Amino acid sequence: MALPALGLDSWSFLGLFLFQLLLLFLPPATTAGREGQGPTPRVKYHAGDGRRALSFFHQKGLQDFDTLLLSDDGGTLYVGAREAILALNIEDPGVPRLKNMIPWPASDRKKSECAFKRKSNETQCFNFIRVLVSFNSTHLYACGTFAFSPACTFIELQDSRLLPISEDRVVEGKGQSPFDPTHKHTAVMADGMLYSGTMNNFLGSEPILLRTLGSQPVLKTDNFLRWLQPDASFVAAIPSTQVVYFFFEETASEFEFFEKLRISRVAQVCKNDVGGEKLLQKKWTTFLKAQLLCTQPEQLPFNVIRHAVLQADNSSTDPQVYAVFTSQWHVGGTRSSAVCAFSLKDIKSVFEGKYKELDKETSRWTTYEYPDISPRPGSCSKGPSSDKALTFMKDHFLMDEPVVGTPLLVKSGVEYTWLAVETAQGIDGQSHLVMYLGTSTGSLHKAVVSGDHSAYLVEEIQLFPDPEPVRNLQLAPTQGAVFVGFSGGIWKVPRANCSVYESCMDCVLARDPHCAWDPESQTCRLLPTPILKSWKQDMQQGNPEWACASGPMGRSLGPRSRPQIIKEVLAVPNSILELPCPQSSALASYHWSHGVEAIPEAPSTVYNGSLLLLLRDGAGGLYQCWATENDFSYPVVSYWVHSQDQPLALDPKLAGIPRERMEAPLTRVGGGAALAAPKSYWPHFLTVTVLLALVLSGALVTFLVSPLGALRARGKVQGCGTLPSREKAPLSSEQCLQPSKEGRTSASDMDADNNLQGTEVA
């Protein structure tokens, strides 16, 4: 729209001048959420943000809520904390409710022994619960560090409540729980037997894979044969039909590298393994391990595995293992993380492939072809293995080929520590993989994997105001929530926050499989079961122009430029206004318009998304902040700006749109107050005014000092500015005394004190 010529009276000239100075002294604008490489969370909630409803459970005197177990019926969450085990009722909405709690502290004798071994009695010499699994419908099985003396026990259940632990049922837990609470570990119950991976000694230098409980014989890895490196660190155990897979990382022995190279592994042991009769007695006879490779082309690999889970989808013929990786190298000085998917078929295929063999003469690993032994060594065949097969297995436990994963999500500047996954069915009938990722700084990311096997981030929730790692994640599908364990308690996070999307287009652009637009209630809601086809969702493209095109959309589409509500700003002339633009999506780009034109030539600037405007004659009218996302543009907020001196009638095209008046004062140049947005720039105005006064004062002083200096220079003795005193070296006839035409500064005119002599009177 054409703008009238602006007259410059004294106040408007001063306002224009101060407005330009204000822009010079504004602090640097902040950049929104595009830190690092990889997908950006569309919506980010800071700690305490009221838009994201969270529930928090804590118990006075307890800490280190590290171990979580969901009951079979999904209504109870069992929690292993420091020296206590809790049962929480999670069926009711809101904060989880404590059913009961049983203490399980380390004995005083064990704590004294722990302190005697130079361990901290403030942070280490306690019983940290590390294993909490369901043994059957009436008992849990728990293990703890027990002040560096691991112990285990059965816990009886009665109506999902925990019965007290009997001391005579506490047994040694070596090999099932770590000694040190900081050591990583894993354990899983499969077919009534406990498979655990942990450190087996006080020093933390003897890793072990152990099978206990059940009817099968107790088996473990052979430490003498170095099947595992001394620094092996276990992160997950996943049972399959015939085998149990262990996921861990250790120092690589098969590669020559200029530094200590960490490598991620998957190992397998057969469930029907009974150990050897002569060789490998009470040892695994089916232990094999292979490299896990999670990398992008021409990039350093993500070689440190942090966690892994199996997506148990009954409809899938090829189950997938999803694992979180970081890198031991900080590329660009920042941490980076990746999520890779591994097919169980690919893992099985690698374990059926070629082996590696250590050449004892060169100390190098070489490829070994298939052995001429039947059944194949390491296979889950029935019956005892031959001595030839067992001899072969002692030295051929490493597979030649790696298991190559598919990168789904790669992000720099973040370190993922935990992972939970589920599938969600959309309106299109397709299943969509949803991942919940905990970070080392206390955030929770919700990611969705699209059809091209790449993930996008729906939201980021900062759980803690201060950085603190997520200790554990437990998904409760029947409750529609994710439970997050950390040092001080348990967070209950609803897995979707549909109500934050206020329009159909915002709901569709979010591409959250749990959310869809209900045209009847005109709200974005959780997708019901069974799915209603009349609801609006587009998981493939996120195109609101297509998804919201038909049916009653409420506050959704219509003419794109037509706002949903107009915020009326009635201000005085020459006032500095801030018109905020709520940036609900970090994936959108934002720009401002004035009517149907671009921002006018009136003094204005965009600062942190907000429009700073000096209101002058002709600068009123409709101001709109626009968002463009996924090639779709829509107005985010609309302002009708006019002055108190010359009210501007609302454009007839905007008739019928609800209006909201803004009544917050802002700076006015020349006195008075303006009505606009809630933030005041009065401090900036004062700063600019003071600086202007200082500049003017400095200029005035400079102007006055220059002539005074010239006058003073004329009054000085020519030649030397000052004459030395009598205590200094006497002046020579050539020093500083130049003959003058008037003869008043010759040596004969000076007395002994270097003073000018007067004329004698006769």
Curated annotation (Swiss-Prot):
Residues 1-32 form the signal peptide. Disulfide bonds join 114-125, 143-152, 270-380, 294-340, 498-515, 507-524. Residues 574-632 form the Ig-like C2-type domain. GO terms for molecular function: chemorepellent activity; neuropilin binding; semaphorin receptor binding. It comes from the Eukaryota. Residues 497-544 form the PSI domain. Keywords: Adaptive immunity, Angiogenesis, Cell membrane, Developmental protein, Differentiation, Disulfide bond, Glycoprotein, Immunity, Immunoglobulin domain, Membrane, Neurogenesis, Signal, Transmembrane, Transmembrane helix. Residues 706-762 are cytoplasmic. InterPro entries: Ig-like_fold, Plexin_repeat, PSI, Semap_dom, Semap_dom_sf, Semaphorin, WD40/YVTN_repeat-like_dom_sf. Residues 37-495 form the Sema domain. Residues 722-762 are annotated as: Disordered. It holds the Pfam family PSI. Cell surface receptor for PLXNB1, PLXNB2, PLXNB3 and PLXND1 that plays an important role in cell-cell signaling. Regulates glutamatergic and GABAergic synapse development. Promotes the development of inhibitory synapses in a PLXNB1-dependent manner and promotes the development of excitatory synapses in a PLXNB2-dependent manner. Plays a role in priming antigen-specific T-cells, promotes differentiation of Th1 T-helper cells, and thereby contributes to adaptive immunity. Promotes phosphorylation of TIMD2. Inhibits angiogenesis. Promotes axon growth cone collapse. PANTHER family: SEMAPHORIN (PTHR11036), SEMAPHORIN-4A (PTHR11036:SF15). This is Semaphorin-4A. It comes from Bos taurus. The lineage of its organism: Eukaryota, Metazoa, Chordata, Craniata, Vertebrata. The gene is SEMA4A.
